[in-house]
Regions:
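Short, small/polar-rich loop/turn modules that mediate ligand/substrate recognition or access, typified
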Residues: 173, 178, 248-250
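Conserved glycine-rich cofactor-binding loop
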Residues: 9, 16-17
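Active-site helix of classical SDR
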Residues: 121, 157, 165
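Residue(s) in the substrate-gating loop at a strand-loop-helix junction
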Residues: 141
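Substrate-binding pocket helix/loop in short-chain dehydrogenase/reductase
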Residues: 73, 97-98, 105-110, 218
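Short C-terminal tail/terminal secondary-structure segment
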Residues: 6, 146, 237-238, 244, ...
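Alpha-helical segment proximal to the catalytic Tyr-Lys
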Residues: 126, 170-171, 246
């Protein structure tokens, strides 16, 4: 299937690793030019080199900006003032006891997970609506609808993304702009793999054994009983970025392996 992304330009925030990097790779494979974003220039350039090895004719542009800060969002817009696709993937997570989370940490999570998307869509989505064409995608989490007691601050930001995305979608009436949210379940990113290694110290479990145990003990409602692979999310995001997905707007879409026990 041709997703008709040739000639399109996408900004994928937080795209030097994990889900963001996989999304960038999927868009590149479909012919889109992609702006690679991370905080460190060295890491951004390294990611571009890796992606170019996979797709030699890839069109990739570096954007080493901290989008968890207003200054970074302003700077990236100044360098790349127009995109066809905006994927708000940037996000942070960290387990923490609710009663021990200080105000500063709540504000940090809000700045990175919410305000980065607010600031970027304020600029890019406005231009998309003016020309009546574009795609905005927020990467949230199943925690948006199934909040976690060990990550209350993270869960709250993910729920907020659903509301923000739907509000923005309402502004696109009469255009070919769409705004949607994708809610992945637990995903096999570098950060999650590191977390699994720390969960069972001294038990000499293989990575596969640790994954199965984690899913059984911590994600018992998952139907697939495994971590989701970043590329599984990325392929779906590529479709949402495509003109072929024009009837999907204002939606919150789960890729969670059946983790959330709901038919809607």
């Amino acid at each position: 299937m041709d997703l008709q992304l040739k000639g399109k330009t996408a900004l994928v925030t937080g795209s030097t690793s994990g889900i963001g990097k996989a999304i960038a790779a999927s868009l590149i494979a479909e012919g889109a030019a992609v702006i690679i974003n991370g905080r460190r220039e060295e890491k951004v350039n390294e990611t571009i080199r890796e992606l170019e090895k996979e797709t030699p004719d890839a069109r990739l542009y570096p954007a080493a900006f901290d989008l968890g800060m207003a200054e970074g969002c302003g700077a990236i817009f100044q360098q790349y003032p127009d995109v066809d696709i905006l994927v708000n993937n940037l996000g942070i997570f960290e387990p923490a006891e609710y009663f021990d989370i200080p105000d500063e940490e709540w504000l940090r999570f809000f700045e990175v997970n919410i305000m980065s998307g607010v600031r970027l869509t304020r600029r890019y989505a406005k231009r998309m609506i003016e020309r009546k064409e574009g795609r905005v995608i927020f990467i949230a989490s199943e925690a948006a609808v199934m909040p976690s007691q060990e990550m209350a601050h993270y869960s709250a930001t993910k729920t907020t993304q659903l509301s923000l995305s739907r509000s923005l979608a309402e502004l696109t009436e009469g255009t070919n702009v769409t705004v949607n949210t994708v809610m992945p379940g637990s995903t096999k990113t570098e950060g999650v793999e590191t977390m699994l290694e720390s969960l069972y110290p001294g038990e000499n479990l293989t990575a596969a054994e640790a994954e199965r145990r984690f899913m059984k003990e911590n994600r018992p409602t998952s139907i697939i009983q495994r971590l989701i692979r970043p590329e599984e999310i990325a392929h779906f995001v590529a479709f949402l970025s495509s003109p072929l997905s024009s009837a999907i707007n204002g939606s919150a879409l789960r890729i969670d392996g059946g983790l959330v026990r709901s038919i809607i």
